[in-house]
Amino acid sequence: MANHKSAEKRNRQNQVARLRNKSTRTAMKNSVRKLDEALEAGVEADTAEALRGAISRIAKTASKGVIHKKTASRKISRLTKRVNALVAA
């Protein structure tokens, strides 16, 4: 329980930010999950489209500061590598 007015305000701000970050992170996870499903199906056209969406969502999440820039880069790299392996096979 906050004892100061500024601490109470900070708690309110943190709650709003937490909900905003959670929403952004969930959207990112959903786009990656969609890509995973496309990879399992093995359809190249769907996979390429899902990859574009996932990359966009991951980059947007990083630009908002929800995840670190290098974490986003690593995720994008790994997903792209998986898609390229499917295309090459």
Curated annotation (Swiss-Prot):
GO molecular-function terms, A-Z: small ribosomal subunit rRNA binding; structural constituent of ribosome
GO biological process: translation
Alphabetic keyword roster: Ribonucleoprotein, Ribosomal protein, RNA-binding, rRNA-binding
Region of interest called Disordered, as start-end residue ranges on this chain: 1-30
One Pfam match: Ribosomal_S20p
One GO cellular component term noted in the UniProt record for this chain: cytosol
Keyword Transmembrane helix: no
UniProt feature, compositional bias: Basic and acidic residues: 1-11
InterPro entries listed in its UniProt record: Ribosomal_bS20 (IPR002583), Ribosomal_bS20_sf (IPR036510)
SUPFAM superfamilies the record matches: Ribosomal protein S20 (SSF46992)
Transmembrane segments: none
Family of this protein: Belongs to the bacterial ribosomal protein bS20 family.
Function: Binds directly to 16S ribosomal RNA.
Protein name as it appears in the record: Small ribosomal subunit protein bS20
Organism of derivation: Desulfotalea psychrophila (strain LSv54 / DSM 12343)
Gene: rpsT
